[in-house]
C-alpha cells in the first residue's frame, strides 16, 4: 500500500488526511524503522507493508466505531503504538493513554510523541494487571483497545476493568476469531461486558481476514479482577 492508496482508501471511508497528518505518518514510519535497528519494535519494516499492516490496519477500527468525539482511550500492550497512535493522528482530539510492560517501548513512544508533536498522550510503564487495579484509572476510559495481544478470555481481564460502565472495549483480531469468541464469551460476561458486534473484513491487497469486536461495558467489573500479573494468561476465565 503506497501513500496515495493509503490516503485514497481512507478518504473513501470519510477519513480525509491533511498534508500535516500525512507528514506525521511519514515521520512515524521513519522513526519506527530507525529505532527498530536498536530494539525489536516490529518485524515489518518495508514501507508499503508498514502503511498497510500497521497504519491502515490500526485505523480500520474507525470504520466500525465513531471516533469523532473527544473520547478517552486506553491502549493495552500497544508496543510500537498500534492501534492508538495512527488513530490519534487521524483524530487529534482523542485523549490517548498507552500501557506497556517494556520501558524501552515507552521510551520510543515518548520520543515519537515529541517528534510528531502529539498532545493529550500519556505512556505508562506497567503491566495491565497492576494498572487495572489503580483507582484513578480503573473504570475511567470511554474506550479500551488492544490489537493482537492475547486471546479474548485473557484480554478481557486485562482490558474490561479499565472501561467505564457504558464504555466500549474494542478488540482487534486476525483470522479464526470465531472459536476465540466462543471461548471468551464467559470471561466477557463475568467481567461486566457484553459482545455487541463482530465485524469481519479483508485487509486490502493481501486479503487477510480481520475481526473487530465491540464489547459494551454493562456493569462494574468485580473487584478481584484483574488478578495478579501472569495469572490471567495461566488460568483464563473459561468454563
Curated annotation (Swiss-Prot):
Residues 219-239 are annotated as: Disordered. GO terms for molecular function: rRNA (guanine-N7-)-methyltransferase activity. Its EC number is 2.1.1.-. S-adenosyl-L-methionine binds at residues 77, 82, 128-129, 147. InterPro entries: rRNA_ssu_MeTfrase_G, SAM-dependent_MTases_sf. Keywords: Cytoplasm, Methyltransferase, rRNA processing, S-adenosyl-L-methionine, Transferase. GO terms for cellular component: cytosol. Pfam families: GidB (PF02527). SUPFAM superfamilies: S-adenosyl-L-methionine-dependent methyltransferases. It is found in: Cytoplasm. Belongs to the methyltransferase superfamily. RNA methyltransferase RsmG family. Specifically methylates the N7 position of guanine in position 535 of 16S rRNA. This is Ribosomal RNA small subunit methyltransferase G. The gene is rsmG.
Amino acid at each position: 500500500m503506497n501513500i496515495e492508496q493509503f490516503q485514497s482508501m481512507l478518504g473513501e471511508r470519510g477519513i480525509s488526511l491533511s498534508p500535516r497528518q500525512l507528514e506525521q505518518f511519514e515521520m512515524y514510519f521513519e522513526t519506527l524503522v530507525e529505532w527498530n535497528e536498536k530494539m525489536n519494535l516490529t518485524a515489518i519494516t518495508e514501507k508499503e507493508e508498514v502503511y498497510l499492516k500497521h497504519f491502515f490496519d490500526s485505523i480500520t477500527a474507525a470504520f466500525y466505531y465513531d471516533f469523532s468525539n473527544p473520547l478517552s482511550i486506553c491502549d493495552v500492550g500497544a508496543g510500537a503504538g498500534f492501534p492508538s497512535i495512527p488513530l490519534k493522528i487521524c483524530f487529534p482530539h482523542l485523549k490517548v493513554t498507552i500501557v506497556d510492560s517494556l520501558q524501552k517501548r515507552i521510551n520510543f513512544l515518548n520520543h515519537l510523541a515529541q517528534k510528531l508533536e502529539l498532545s493529550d498522550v500519556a505512556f505508562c510503564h506497567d503491566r495491565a494487571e497492576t494498572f487495572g487495579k489503580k483507582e484513578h484509572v480503573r473504570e475511567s476510559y470511554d474506550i479500551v483497545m488492544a490489537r493482537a495481544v492475547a486471546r479474548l478470555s485473557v484480554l478481557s481481564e486485562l482490558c474490561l476493568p479499565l472501561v467505564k460502565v457504558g464504555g466500549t472495549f474494542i478488540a482487534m483480531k486476525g483470522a479464526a476469531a470465531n472459536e476465540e469468541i466462543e471461548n471468551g464469551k464467559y470471561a466477557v460476561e463475568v467481567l461486566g461486558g457484553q459482545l455487541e458486534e463482530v465485524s469481519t473484513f479483508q485487509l486490502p491487497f493481501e486479503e487477510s481476514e480481520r475481526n473487530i469486536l465491540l464489547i459494551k461495558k454493562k456493569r462494574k467489573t468485580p473487584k478481584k479482577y484483574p488478578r495478579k500479573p501472569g495469572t490471567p494468561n495461566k488460568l483464563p476465565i473459561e468454563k
